[in-house]
């Protein structure tokens, strides 16, 4: 089952979320917005099972990555934009 995965610009490019994902949903891509010069990307959300291991692994105070499940998708993502 596919879930919406949102990467926020608070990402510090640490790769913790990418390494935590058991299904390789995430990857790092070049980005000039942080010192690491990279940001997480979610090109394979169709493989996301919603385990939220990426969220748990994120070391930022404000979770830089969020997985939205079912009704949570439209409700929460609507607030983010």
Swiss-Prot record:
The gene is psaC. Its EC number is 1.97.1.12. It is a peripheral membrane protein. GO terms for molecular function: 4 iron, 4 sulfur cluster binding; electron transfer activity; metal ion binding; oxidoreductase activity. It is found in: Cellular thylakoid membrane. This is Photosystem I iron-sulfur center. One of its GO terms (cellular component) is photosystem I. The cyanobacterial PSI reaction center is composed of one copy each of PsaA,B,C,D,E,F,I,J,K,L,M and X, and forms trimeric complexes. [4Fe-4S] cluster 2 binds at residues 21, 48, 51, 54. PROSITE patterns: 4FE4S_FER_1, 4FE4S_FER_2. It is an enzyme of class 1 (oxidoreductase). It comes from Synechococcus sp. (strain CC9902). The keyword Membrane applies.
